[in-house]
């Protein structure tokens, strides 16, 4: 008999806790069930309070985008390190500490760059991505805004121009072409129907507030490693973005960029390193069809090897122009990209009425 009272008290406490949690879950479901998914994602984002300083993982430097075909974008106001290199983003959520007015200053030639991790500057520090080098080389009349984000494909880049960059009144657009412009985005947003009756709003909220911050992603995004996700959720997520994969999607995106830029008389440069093979030829054809300039930087890279009396083979190329064990352009490669772009851009700018 004496044992029954403590057991009863413990049971009562546990039941009360269960009912409180159940009530909280029901309340969250009732409130957010009739609202947009982005509303709950915003609450999770505030609860998560992801760091903006210190050593940042890839999942901590991006956030879900409000535009479906952009999918995700850089978080504004970052001031830390990424892959051991300094990283800053400004109020627009683009790489670099320099702030740009939304209204273009008089007498300014404004350039926007669209690309993935190569343009973003994966593995190099502040001042070292080629668009930052280019801006410095061109001088004070020029602004170069880097909208490059790791893992972007061609459709995302054009959507970024349409919904984010076009309103900044650019005079020139640079698109960095590489082979994965035809592939799936690095991160995906979860399908809106993914939150089922078995999925807990309360658990997500607690995870966002108290869970590990190590390499986590924005609440509106699925983790890059999707192997641990439910197979049906993976299938739905991939299906949601099937329209932006493959050569037809790329060609459609380039045609859309052509429509948007021709209407305002804005020239477009497609920057590539080589641009041969099936994918490169497709990019060349898309550029020609839309009146873009296809700029192959590889002759300058080859000339550098000649100047340094180095062999022209794959291993020498990799060790000279790539980050070790990574494959992304190193500081030297970014310098050469900037050099290649500078001459072409000065020629275009001279034809502009200031």
Regions found by a protein language model. Name each.
Residues 36-137, 305, 313-316, 320-324:
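Membrane/wall-proximal cationic-aromatic binding patches
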Residues 178-311, 315-326:
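Serine-dependent acyl-ester chemistry module
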Residues 28, 247, 317-354:
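Histidine-centered active-site loop/cap adjacent to the catalytic His
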Residues 132, 136, 159, 163, ...:
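Solvent-exposed, polar/charged alpha-helical surfaces in well-ordered, non-transmembrane soluble domains
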Residues 86, 110-112, 118-199:
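Conserved SGNH/GDSL esterase-like catalytic core that processes O-acyl groups on lipids
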Residues 25, 116, 157, 173, ...:
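Generic structural signal for small/hydrophobic residues in well-ordered secondary structure
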Residues 11-26:
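Hydrophobic membrane-insertion alpha-helices, especially the h-region
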Residues 26-38:
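Helix-to-loop transition at the C-terminal end of transmembrane segments
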